Structure formats: C-alpha cells, structure tokens
C-alpha cells in the first residue's frame, strides 16, 4: 500500500512529465486564473447592483446588469479554453508515459514475462494510463482551479467584511480533517480494486489465448467459477469505495456548507443591521460561500479518482522502472562473419537454483546442421534461449566465430540468426508486411523469399496476393501455410544462422514433405541448429545430440546412434513402431 511519502513521490514524478509542455501548461493555468478572477468579481457586481440600483432602476442600472451577464459569458468562454488546453496537456503526457512504459517493456528479458501475466501488463498500459489521463484532464485542473478560487474568494471576502469571513473560516479545519480522514481510509481499498482489475484482465487474456483447450476439455464451468470469484471480489471492493465516497464526500461537505449558511444568516439576523452589513453584502457572502465550498466539494468528490490515479501511476512507473533486462552485451562491436558456433562447458539455470543445462559442449560450422533431441524438459529449447541471449548463462563460454557472444550487439546477433518456431507467429497486417517484418525489403525480395520456400504458389492464388490481409495470429491460414510464411520471413532476413525449434511438429505428413523441401533449401550455406520431435526430420544432420536432464548423453550421426543402441535407438524405435501402427 502506498504511504503518504510514496504518494508524493509518484505525484512529483507525474508532474515532471509537464516540463515539455511548460508553455501550454502556463497558458492553461492563465485561463484558469482568469476564470477565478471573473468568478470573484461577479458577486461584487451583483452586490453593488442590489445596494445601489435595485430600488432605483435607471440607465446606469441597465449597464451594470449588462456587465453582470457579460462577465458570465466571458467566464464560460475563458473556462472552456482553459479546460481545452488542460486536455491537450493531459493526452500528451499520457502518450509520453505509455511510450516510456512500452519502450522499457520491449527491452525486458524473458524472465520478466515468465513471471508476469500478460493481462497485468496490458492493464498497466491501457486502464492505468487512462486513469492518469482522467487525473490530468479533469482532476488536476479542478484542484488548481479550486486553489485559485479559494484564494481569490477568501481575499475578496476579507476585503468585503472580515467579521463574516472569520465566521466562515471556522469551518475550514473541519473540511481539511474530513479530506485527510477520507484519504487514509480510501488508499487501501483503491489499491485492492486496481489489483483485482488487473487480475480480471489477466484471466481474460489467459482464457482467450487458450479457448480451444478450454472447450476441448470441457473446462468452461471451472474457469467461469474462477472468473466469477475474482469478478465478485472486485465488485465488493468497488462497492466499498462507493460507500466511502457517499459517506465522506458530497453529503458531509454539503452539510458543512448548509451549516455555514445557517451561521451566516443567524449572525446577519442578530447583528447585521446594527453593525452596518447591507443586503448586497449579505447576498455577496452567500455567493462566496458557494464559491468557497463548491470547489472543495468538487475536489473531495474527485479525491477517489486522484487516489486511483496515484495507485495506477505507481503501477505504470513500476513497469517503467523494471530492470529485468535481457543479458547485457559488452562492447557490442563484433560482427558475425561465417556463423560458426561453439558451446564450451555451458551451465544454465532459469532461477539460479535448479540447473537446466549442465556442462554442455558442442560446435557447428557454416554449412553444417546439428540437431538436439530428447524428452520434454531435457533442455533442448534452453540451448536456443542461451544462444539467442534471451537469458544469461551462469558459466562456460558461448563463441560465435571464435568471439565471445557477449561481444556482439543484440541487433547484430539477432539479425544474423533466423528463428523458426513450432508455432509460427503472424502479425495483423498483410502477407507482404509479415514477410518483410517492416524492414526495407523490396517487393521483389519478398516475392523471391516466398518463392524460395514454395510459399509463392498459394499466395498468388489469393485474391489480393501479397497484399492479402493477415488476421491476428494468421488464423485464416492453415498451419502449413503459416509455417511457410514464417520460412519466407526468415529467408528474407538473410541470416547466417538458422534455428529450427520443432518447426514441423504441428504439420501433417502431407504438408511435411513440402516444408522439408523448403527447409533443405534454407539450410544450404547456413549454420543450422534443429530441435526435433520427429526424428525422421533430422536423419541427415551432420551430428545429433541426445539430451537428458540437461546433459548430452549421446552424440553422432543417425546411423551411428542407431548402431549404439542407446536412448536415441529406443526413441527412434518407438516412433517407427507408432508410425507402423497407424499404417
């Protein structure tokens, strides 16, 4: 829970985003100040009219009335411009905060995403930033306007009659006590409400992502119950927040204002005429009480939103300040030449406690293909994670062209490694943009890459060809078509190293022959590392490494490993037997 000091820290940091918009903010504040000055003058004009002209209407009285209504019109126009300027500042600040949060998120390492639900991140970048926007566009201007109005009104009241002003000021300590009490009680409830909203987003994202599995295994009722539980808890805390607002805000503040009226009227009735207080002055004071209390009522009504904004800003800043980055590179000056890879006694653990890779050593050169096989959890994909620098290894060396992998920049490393995953990921856009990945790739290069992997044939059959739209995750294409597009994307980037992470695992046997032909062409002249479930797809590898519990237990060609009669032989025999049973 945020304490008072943390809230001030968050608020000061939010205010720092105002710096680039200093002139715009100054103009907005100027218009707000002008609005409050006009509001303060209007009751004086009314008071003067009541005392001087109400019983003696003449041409000058008409002029005073015109001034009175003209001030109201001017106040409306000036207030509109001020609010408009504040809204522009608000949206600009939220844009900057989202930009900073997204930029930092893009640099975070895989370990952060392993432990943070996607829905929680989305909630911070959308819901929480929208709450911050509400604070700047409405609440902040209300707070500043309230301060201006309070000070100008108080000054005008003191000039008009200090005795009546002293009576009104007796209520101020009660107001500040009320606001402080509300602040203390509301913070915890608001933080819990925002946290539960984040949980709802996470649960929604998880269910949408896994809807096929949920329906296939009849998990709808169980997950509905889990969602209802979180949703109900959110409702409970939301109702608590509303109840707190209803108790401490308008009813309490309105009661204080009515008490102020009562005290003022009683004092006027008891001593008003004897000490020379005019009806016009009394009218002006009633108006000033409204102007004194109404901004305070508005501020207290917006206080819950301010508290919510403080909590939301704290969550967004936590994302901006997150430093679980990808492994750091050293000087980053090295360039990939051939793409020769060597692991020397590499050990790796995701949590620093449980080893995933234990003393891994192997090498592969340009034009060669090696493969890693093993049961689930044996460490196959972890080797790729280490090579791609998604995670930092604890000991050993990883060399690329005999240069420590840390001496390459992330950009140099990633642009020379083509990664093809088991589940090809396509972005919302077009086929052309998915192959080019928004790089400076010509249409001819895109088409050549597609033709190289035999994807051109089905693309040309589409009504819009390479400009055909791609829906989210490419759901309108078959698995084989999505994989061919992923191959074309890799070829278009012209990498020196090719990594195939079970690239054919989800493809049917009929499509596999086409995909394998494309893979064979892609591997030519490149350093290739393949992770395979189907052993039939890696029989032509120069060397096959068998992993078990993070260690290499066997290595050799397909024929050598079969002759060895070990783990690989058993795995191959099981797959061959399963294949025979299906025929």
UniProtKB/Swiss-Prot annotation:
The keyword Nucleotide-binding applies. ATP binds at residues 374-381. It is found in: Cell membrane. It is a multi-pass membrane protein. Residues 341-574 form the ABC transporter domain. GO terms for cellular component: plasma membrane. The chain crosses the membrane at residues 26-46, 61-81, 135-155, 159-179, 259-279. Its main location: membrane. Keywords: ATP-binding, Cell membrane, Membrane, Nucleotide-binding, Transmembrane, Transmembrane helix, Transport. GO terms for molecular function: ABC-type oligopeptide transporter activity; ATP binding; ATP hydrolysis activity. The keyword Coiled coil does not apply. It holds the Pfam family ABC_membrane. Residues 25-308 form the ABC transmembrane type-1 domain. Belongs to the ABC transporter superfamily. This is Putative ABC transporter ATP-binding protein exp8. It comes from Streptococcus pneumoniae serotype 4 (strain ATCC BAA-334 / TIGR4).
